[in-house]
Amino acid sequence: MIDIKKNIIEIKKNILNLELRSNRKKNSVTLMAVSKTKTSEDIREAYEAGQKDFGENYLQESIDKIQDLSDLDIIWHYIGKIQSNKSKLIAENYNWIHSVDKISTLKKISDYRKNFKNKNKINVCIQVNIDNEETKSGINLQSLENFIKETYDFDGVNIRGIMAIPMYTDTYESQYKTFIRIKNIFDNLVNKGYKLDTLSIGMSSDYDAAIAAGSTLVRIGTSIFGERQK
């Protein structure tokens, strides 16, 4: 039996310790609970344990859960592949998107979002394919700055930062090395004057290295909810 509350408490304690070890400010890292394939009851249990940010991959499944849990002030993050014809649903239901890699799709989302009454701009992290893997989504590094510039007149979105899923490796040293590369890219953009504050890197297997490198948001599912259902 998975003890969701216990897992969340332990992970948040770990994050605080990692912040301290890395000379980071307390609570400078946001925990996103990745709840894809998990039930509304699982999410409610996590919420009652103090978890507010949840990430979903599968649109229709997530819309059902968002409706089921509309009585809770959850911050919903979309982290799945974005289909252009689903842009309106994403714009209507989510607070954040972490998987943007097409300017045309982002323009659609922006246009839909600004037409919804009582909706703030949707927060966006641009997905970067840091290792140029053919099997992963994300824009290449050479295109990143121009991509951001193209969003300047998109009134329905707020570009907050970048998201990356590096190539898998099982050693802390290699994980940290890759995350530092991403952090340097992020810092370079900030130093150029881009108003970015979110670096979405790190998952269950590598969030310690990600936090040491400078992550501001980690996406954790398995360590909270257990192995996901097939």
Question: Locations of the language-model features?
Answer:
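Expand to "…catalyze enediolate/carbanion chemistry for C-C bond making/breaking, isomerization
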Residues: 211-212, 224-230
